[in-house]
Amino acid sequence: MTGLAGPAGPAGSAAGADAGERLARAALTRIAEPGTTALVRAADRLGAAAVWAAVRGEAGAPDLDADLLELLRKHPAEFPPERDLELAAGLGARFICPQDDEWPAGLAVLGGEEPLALWVRGELLLSEAFDRAVAVVGARAATAYGGRVASE
C-alpha cells in the first residue's frame, strides 16, 4: 500500500539514520526542550551520537557549546533511549529522524529551527501527511500565555 508506514516502529523508515544516531536523537529529545536550536545544529554538525556521548561524559566536546552542554547535563536521562523506542513501538508509534526517507522535506522552511526528530503515531507516511496536517504541540515549560491559550 502506498503512503502507509510499515512496521518499522523504533527503526523509523527503511532507509535513514543508523542505530547509534537514532538512539542518540531519542535520548536527546528526552532531555532537551523543543526549540533548542543550538542542539539541532550541533547534532547536524557533529552527529547526534557524538553530542550524546559528550553529554554523558564519555567523550570530549571541544566543538560543543559549553552553555549547551551544561544545559543538557542538568536533565539526566532516567530511561535508556532503547526503552523509549520500544514503548513507542508498542503504542504504534515510530521515531523519525532527519536522515529517514519519511522526514518531511517541508520542514526545511524552518531554516535551522527544525526539530531534532519526530515521534509519530499512525500509519500514514509523515512525508505525505505533512502538507495536509495540523499539529498542536507544547513544551514542558509552558509560558503563561501558552497555558492561557491552551485552556481556552
What are these regions (language model features)?
Residues 1-151:
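Short, positively charged patches
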